[in-house]
């Protein structure tokens, strides 16, 4: 097993085919692939990863200053804090400055997309679209298990594919971020109302949970 050293993980930037962001090629001693990252808007940062490791690889770091929503599109391995395996097509949440550690298995493509957003930006956007929408994103991002929300998963994967199409416009990417936040807000509002009214979990969530357990 090899542990990633941040000072040599990326060896060079790749010529960027779109107008913003940076593509980084990874060091061949770790594997093949790249990572694209961009502060598309000053309130959120997007990272798209497509890497195939040569051997068992450990990655340890701390999450940045914002809340992070991640979608594993493909990949295999184990995350710590808490311990759980990495499953394709599942979402994960990370809080600001949270400790992150994972071991990725070799020769299985690690494809994922993360969106880091600022709490103030989320609050401001929610106020604009619905002044009375009471949702608590900070509690949502305390969720430490992997989960599946159909609309959010689809929007995140669509954004990943759009970014890798090399035709992604900044305006469209921003619109997709707002779409993802709106889906999350709707989900949180629906579940808050269900709790207040004593309603059971909805059929969509039951199906999602069933898919995770099989």
What do the predicted segments below correspond to?
Residues 1, 96-105, 119-122, 176-178, ...:
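Hydrophobic transmembrane alpha-helix bundles
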Residues 1-22, 26:
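Short Lys/Arg-enriched alpha/beta "domain-start" segment
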Residues 2, 10, 45, 65, ...:
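Alpha-helical structural motif
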Residues 5-14, 122-126, 137, 159-163:
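Generic structural signal of hydrophobic/aromatic residues within well-ordered alpha-helices
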Residues 23-135:
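N-terminal regulatory/effector-sensing and dimerization cores
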Residues 122-123, 130-139, 145-158:
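A short mid-domain helix/strand-loop element embedded in enzyme catalytic domains
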Residues 148-164, 174-188, 193-214:
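A short, Lys/Arg-enriched amphipathic alpha-helix from helix-turn-helix/homeodomain DNA-binding modules
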Residues 168-170:
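Solvent-exposed loop/turn segments connecting transmembrane beta-strands
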């Amino acid at each position: 097993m090899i542990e990633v050293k941040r000072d040599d993980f990326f060896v060079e930037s790749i010529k960027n085919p779109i107008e913003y962001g940076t593509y980084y090629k990874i060091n061949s001693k770790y594997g093949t692939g790249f990572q694209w990252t961009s502060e598309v808007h000053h309130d959120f940062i997007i990272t798209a990863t497509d890497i195939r490791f040569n051997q068992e690889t450990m990655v340890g770091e701390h999450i940045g200053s914002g809340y992070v929503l991640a979608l594993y599109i493909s990949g295999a391995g184990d995350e710590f804090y808490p311990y759980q395996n990495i499953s394709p097509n599942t979402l994960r949440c990370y809080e600001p400055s949270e400790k992150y550690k994972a071991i990725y298995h070799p020769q299985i493509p690690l494809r994922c997309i993360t969106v880091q957003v600022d709490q103030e930006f989320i609050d401001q956007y929610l106020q604009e679209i619905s002044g009375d929408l009471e949702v608590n994103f900070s509690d949502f991002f305390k969720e430490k298990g992997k989960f599946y929300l159909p609309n959010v998963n689809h929007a995140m994967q669509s954004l990943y594919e759009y970014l890798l199409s090399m035709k992604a416009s900044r305006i469209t990417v921003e619109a997709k971020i707002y779409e993802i936040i709106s889906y999350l807000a709707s989900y949180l509002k629906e579940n808050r109302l269900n709790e207040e009214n004593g309603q059971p979990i909805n059929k969509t969530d039951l199906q999602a949970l069933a898919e995770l357990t099989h």
